[in-house]
Regions:
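Short hydrophobic beta-strand that contains or immediately precedes a catalytic carboxylate
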Residues: 94-95, 246, 264-266
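Active-site microenvironments that recognize anionic phosphate/pyrophosphate groups
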Residues: 24-27, 31, 35-47, 51, ...
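Coil-to-beta-strand transition motifs
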Residues: 135-137, 145-151, 241-244, 257-262, ...
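ATP-binding N-terminal substructure of ATP-dependent carboxylate-amine bond-forming enzymes
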Residues: 1-61, 70-80
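ATP-dependent carboxylate/phosphate-activation module, predominantly the ATP-grasp catalytic core
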Residues: 146-238, 268, 273-298
């Protein structure tokens, strides 16, 4: 049987949604009102709204330079925009779907000559971002209930890495890795798969900090310090309509994180998972304790702000948006994998 870390998402998350339903009953809260925990964001940021709009809800000083490339923009104009952005901010740069999840469809552009080749892949609206070239990535979970802000969890994202043996190629070692999935083709194509790494040489494979894309997550909540909390609270508390979610951040090293010196690559909302629960050294019971505690916090934050005005679609429209967005994202991801 697979370790619970690798269970299908719907199976693993079922108890969370059942408990969240109980919390809604307890507070007499319509489930749709869970979005009101983050009433400043499109439906609380449940994965159907613009990541660019979410980013703009915060002070931009910690975020990468970002522009929006609309899907309907002609390819020739996209090429001009990308080159102008690269001239201003340098290469590499990142392109990622504006409505996306788990690292699907993300493209790293390190060479001007490859810009023309990626244009046919950009069928949905994309974010054009400066690449934050810092080696360590963390998820930092934030919650604010009854005026009390907290960092409820931290996880480090350990990027898939192979160790050379002087015999096998990068491609062979990657496909023998216990965390390997077909998604790895997203970044293996940017490496020389035929190269044979020297014995004990470490080769980092990925640039996407996603569990689905092969990252191992560890529970590093003990890294929280007053300095880190102050930096997180300064960013998040300034937006009263954001009370529950995870910041994905990059830092120079652990000491920098503890000092509150980080860059935010993405802010996530009510659909955020407390990813420190995925630590493979922990137990299933421990993971669910973390998960259900965050269900409680989400329901309490939403109940606190239940009277805030917020445009919420009918369930039918939400379901249609989710289905359409997932279909477009999966199609885009397959295009990127097949390029």
């Amino acid at each position: 049987m697979k370790h619970w870390e690798f269970w299908p998402a719907r199976l693993f998350e079922a108890p969370y949604y059942a408990y969240l339903g109980l919390m809604c009953l307890r507070h007499a809260l319509p489930p749709k009102f869970l979005a009101k925990a983050n009433y400043a964001l499109d439906h609380g940021e449940i994965g159907i709204g613009s990541k660019y709009a979410t980013q703009l809800a915060f002070d931009q000083s910690r975020f990468p330079a970002t522009e929006l490339l609309e899907a309907e923009t002609p390819d020739a104009d996209k090429a001009v925009r990308i080159r102008e952005f690269a001239a201003q901010h340098g290469l590499p740069l990142i392109l990622k779907p504006d409505i996306g999840a788990v690292g699907k469809g993300v493209i790293k552009v390190a060479d001007d000559a490859k810009i023309e080749a990626i244009l046919p892949l950009l069928r949905c609206t994309y974010l054009l971002q400066d690449y934050i070239d810092l080696p360590n990535e963390y998820g930092v979970f934030y919650a604010r209930v009854r005026g009390r802000s907290r960092v409820t969890g931290i996880n480090q994202k350990h990027f898939p890495t192979i160790t050379g043996n002087g015999l096998h190629t990068v491609g062979q070692l990657a496909r023998a890795h216990y965390r390997y999935t077909a998604h790895w083709d997203l970044f293996l194509r940017d490496l020389d798969e035929s190269r044979v790494p020297a014995r004990d040489e470490q080769v980092r494979l990925s640039f996407v900090g996603s569990h689905t894309m092969g990252c191992k997550f560890t529970n590093d909540t003990a890294l929280a310090t007053p300095e880190l909390e102050a930096a997180v609270f300064k960013l998040c508390d300034a937006q009263p309509g954001y009370n529950f979610g995870r910041l994905d951040v990059r830092t120079r090293d652990e000491a920098a994180l503890r000092a509150g010196d980080f860059r935010v690559i993405e802010a996530n909302g009510v659909a955020s998972l407390p990813t420190h629960m995925f630590d493979p050294s922990g137990s299933l019971a421990g993971a669910y304790a973390i998960f259900l505690e965050h269900a409680r916090l989400l329901a309490e934050a939403a109940n606190e702000h239940r009277h805030q005005p917020m445009a919420l679609s009918a369930w039918r429209n939400i379901a249609a948006r989710v289905k359409a967005n997932q279909s477009l994202l999966n199609d885009t991801h397959q295009r990127v994998l097949s390029r």
